[in-house]
């Protein structure tokens, strides 16, 4: 501990010496000793004077002067006021003037001759010539005076230019001196600040060292005192007492050792606490010094920045004053370069924009080309589809015509009992012929189709009469154009759900022609294709049905069923029928319908009936066909069995459901494209169009059903 105290004392002495050096430096800068602290009262007296406050001394002096009597007299206040005083002054002036006027009148002033001389108004020519001749001396004099004036002016000009240059130099020198003075002043301030900061730091160090020395001295005294106490035994109770026995024994020896251990532990703890306290005291000034150093660094940086700003401002001022052309040229060149760079940047930006616009235009063109190509492909594909459809229609027509010729030759041997079954189907014939009569106004060729349809339908219905009635199933509704027709069919004829795999497929194709003329020749199709819009046509392949067995059936069921259907269809046919026809057409239609239903006619009679039916009326045709067909259907129904009619009914109904579903899907998929490619729309005939659509679906169904029925009849006859 003695060594620690010595080191601390040495540090304290060094700190005192450094503090003295700092004080001397401060004294050199400020001219006074920082340790000399003047009292507060002396400062106040020096600032305020003898009065001790602001303005009090002057009042005391004034009072002293006024009391002494040697000073100026007190101001005498005029009680009358400013107006009275001004009026009195005016009066005195007037009185003085009045007194001086008579004195001036008494003294007479001497008269003086006027110096004004009247000049001659007109100068003669001689006078002017003489004046010019006499001016040679005047000219020389004027030249001399002019030269002197010019010389003086030039001298003044030179002096002014020199003076301006000198003034500029002086201003530059003064500015430099001012800058230097500011720098010196800042340096002095910085030095002074640093010195005072050093002084404060030294003073704090001295205080800490003094505290350390005091603590070290106290610690030494405590150690000396405790070193003496270690030799004694300390009691366990408090306050602790130290004692020494007169005679030592092993028990007392143990007590001495225990007390020494405890005292040594106390000494160690006290030393550790002392060292920690000294370390804390050293850490405080270190923190303060670090903060002060940081502040100094920040201040130095600020000073440097200010100096640099001052130098830059000084250079700018010098450039402005001297007007250096070189710098101006450089500035102009720099400005031009900047402008060029800006122009280059703008040009690059414009080029990029143009390139982007060109790319966009190219993309738009490519898209348009692709769209045009797609549209052309669609247009090319649509005519091909239409041509395929036409070819299929022609092939089907030829096949149907051949089959009809063969069937007419074979069916001549049918029994006459079939006439009775045709009578029961009279209402159905009337209903299905009515749409043909309604569509009669569209074209003359349609009635040929209706006549053929009647022939085929009569045979179909004759075979249906003998069939048993299956379970009715709801038929799905097609497009809204065919709703009235399908509702009537559902009332009169129930439909089966599924079709056996032996049935052939139906083809639904879109053709640009009215639907009732599917079975007509190609010569009739071409002119009507221009008149009507696009409609869907049902084409059926020639069906090949399996061998069917024959069973008898009762007549009563078929009669009641056919009559109920006939009533429903008669109601609809009456609302639509039109009364305009001729007697010759009616007779020909009756002969054609009777021949077709009884299968006793030939191909020549069918052609004559088709030509005559083109001019026939709806009402006469309905009546004649109903009478003949009813008698034939009744005669046929007697000779047919139960099972054969059931199987035929199933096949026909399934065909009808398939054709209606295919017709719907075909109309939804192909109707729009075929309408766009060919044909002109007839806006004024929407009702006729709907009727033609319904008629087309019926005609397709009738043709397929009639063919099936004929084949089944042939097979039955062979058996």
Swiss-Prot record:
Ranges of Basic residues composition bias in the record: 557-577, 636-653
Q: Coiled-coil intervals in this record?
A: 2-32, 163-234, 287-379, 446-467
Residue(s) of cross-link: Glycyl lysine isopeptide (Lys-Gly) (interchain with G-Cter in SUMO2) = 109, 121, 137, 155, 157, 228, 280, 304, 311, 359, 365, 530, 538, 555
- Report the InterPro entries cross-referenced here: Pinin, Pinin_SDK_MemA, Pinin_SDK_N
| PTM annotation (Phosphoserine): residues | 48, 58, 66, 96, 100, 114-115, 347, 375, 381, 443, 450, 554, 660, 694, 697
Kindly state the subunit structure of this protein: Found in a mRNA splicing-dependent exon junction complex (EJC). Found in a complex with SR proteins. Found in a mRNP complex with RNPS1. Component of the PSAP complex consisting of RNPS1, SAP18 and PNN. Interacts with PNISR, CTBP1, CTBP2, KRT8, KRT18, KRT19, PS1D/PNO40, PPIG, RNPS1, SFRS4 and SRRM2. Identified in the spliceosome C complex.
Q: What is this protein called?
A: Pinin
Query: Gene that codes for this?
Result: PNN
């Amino acid at each position: 501990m003695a060594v620690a105290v010595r080191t601390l004392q040495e540090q304290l002495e060094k700190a005192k010496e450094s503090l003295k050096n700092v004080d001397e430096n401060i004294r050199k800068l400020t001219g006074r000793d920082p340790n000399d602290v003047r009292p507060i009262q002396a400062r106040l007296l020096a600032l305020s004077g003898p009065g001790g406050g602001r303005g009090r001394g002057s009042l005391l002096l004034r009072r002293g002067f006024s009391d002494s009597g040697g000073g100026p007299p007190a101001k005498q206040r005029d009680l009358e006021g400013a107006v009275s005083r001004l009026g009195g002054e005016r009066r005195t002036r007037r009185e003085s003037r009045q007194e001086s006027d008579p004195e001036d009148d008494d003294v007479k002033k001497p008269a003086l001759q006027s110096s004004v001389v009247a000049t001659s108004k007109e100068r003669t020519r001689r006078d002017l010539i003489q004046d010019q001749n006499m001016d040679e001396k005047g000219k020389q004099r004027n030249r001399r005076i002019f030269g002197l004036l010019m010389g003086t002016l030039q001298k003044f000009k030179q002096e002014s230019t020199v003076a301006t240059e000198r003034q500029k130099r002086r201003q530059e020198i003064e500015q430099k001196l001012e800058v230097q003075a500011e720098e010196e002043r800042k340096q002095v301030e910085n030095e002074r600040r640093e010195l005072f900061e050093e002084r404060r730091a030294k003073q704090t160090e001295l205080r800490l060292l003094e505290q350390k020395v005091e603590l070290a001295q106290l610690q030494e005294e405590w150690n000396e005192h405790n070193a003496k106490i270690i030799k004694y035994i300390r009691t366990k109770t408090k306050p602790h007492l130290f004692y020494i026995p007169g005679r030592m024994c092993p028990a007392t020896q143990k007590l001495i050792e225990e007390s020494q251990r405890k005292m040594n532990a106390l000494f160690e703890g006290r030393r550790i606490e002392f060292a920690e306290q000294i370390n804390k005291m050293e850490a405080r000034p270190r923190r303060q010094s670090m903060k002060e150093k940081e502040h100094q660094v920040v201040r130095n940086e600020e000073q440097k920045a200010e100096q640099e700003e001052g130098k830059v401002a000084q250079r700018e001022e010098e450039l402005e004053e001297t007007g250096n052309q070189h710098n101006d040229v450089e500035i102009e060149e720099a400005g031009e370069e900047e402008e060029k760079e800006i122009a280059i940047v703008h040009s690059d930006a414009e080029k990029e924009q143009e390139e982007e616009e060109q790319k966009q235009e190219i993309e738009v063109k490519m898209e348009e080309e692709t769209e045009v190509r797609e549209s052309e492909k669609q247009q090319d594909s649509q005519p091909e589809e239409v041509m395929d459809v036409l070819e299929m229609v022609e092939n089907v027509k030829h096949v149907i015509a051949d089959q009809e010729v063969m069937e007419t030759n074979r069916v001549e041997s049918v029994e006459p009992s079939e006439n009775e079954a045709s009578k029961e189907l009279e209402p159905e014939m009337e209903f299905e012929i009515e749409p043909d009569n309604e569509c009669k106004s569209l074209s003359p060729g349609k009635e040929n189709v209706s006549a053929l349809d009647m022939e085929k339908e009569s045979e179909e219905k004759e075979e249906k009469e003998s069939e048993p009635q299956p379970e009715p199933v709801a038929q799905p509704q097609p497009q809204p154009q065919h709703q009235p027709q399908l509702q009537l069919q559902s009332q009169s004829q129930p439909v089966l759900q599924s079709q056996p795999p032996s049935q052939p497929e139906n083809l639904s194709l879109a053709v640009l022609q009215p639907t009732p003329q599917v079975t007509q020749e190609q010569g009739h199709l071409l002119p009507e294709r221009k008149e009507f819009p696009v409609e869907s046509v049902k084409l059926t392949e020639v069906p090949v049905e399996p061998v069917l067995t024959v069973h008898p059936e009762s007549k009563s069921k078929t009669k009641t069923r056919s009559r109920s259907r006939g009533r429903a269809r008669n109601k609809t046919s009456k609302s639509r029928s039109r009364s305009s026809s001729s007697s010759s057409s009616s007779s020909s239609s009756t002969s054609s319908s009777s021949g077709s239903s009884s299968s006793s006619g030939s191909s020549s009679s069918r052609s004559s009936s088709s030509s005559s039916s083109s001019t026939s009326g709806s009402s006469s045709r309905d009546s004649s066909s109903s009478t003949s067909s009813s008698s034939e259907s009744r005669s046929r129904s007697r000779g047919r069995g139960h099972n054969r009619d059931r199987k035929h009914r199933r096949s026909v109904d399934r065909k009808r459901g398939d054709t209606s579903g295919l017709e719907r899907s075909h109309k939804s998929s192909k109707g729009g494209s075929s309408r766009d490619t060919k044909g002109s729309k007839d806006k004024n005939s929407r009702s006729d169009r709907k009727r033609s659509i319904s008629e087309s679906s019926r005609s397709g169904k009738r043709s397929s059903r009639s063919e099936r029925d004929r084949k089944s009849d042939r097979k039955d006859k062979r058996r």
